[in-house]
Amino acid sequence: MSNFKKTTVDMSASRTELHDLLDLTGSEVSINNLPAGAKVPFVHIHKKNEEVYGVLAGKGFMNIDGEDIALNAGDWLRVDPSAKRQLRAAEDSAITVLCIQAQAGSLADYSLTDGVIV
């Protein structure tokens, strides 16, 4: 059995979830593409997971608890589990975001304390 797993995804797909493709056990990662003017069709919260959004391309907005946060390529945004959120693309631009979910408060170590040089 290998100690890694690689996959290739269609970067133009509307949504790709990597948990099954990579056998993830500690986080959920998805790639999300919205065309210009489109939005996620629901507002949501999480029971336990915080989310980190990285804007890979384009621009748009994240509505968090009623406040619109402008997003542009290169921006990163962390959202608490209980915050109501909805992503939408700008009227004149598509948006591609990487979303990482992990249980809030579960990070026990960081790169410098968890990594071991071998």
Identify what each model region corresponds to:
Residues 48-50, 54-60, 65:
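Glycine- and acidic-residue-biased ligand/ion/polar-headgroup-sensing regions
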Residues 66-82:
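Short acidic-glycine-tyrosine-enriched beta hairpin
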Residues 15, 30-47:
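Conserved short histidine dyad/triad with adjacent acidic residue
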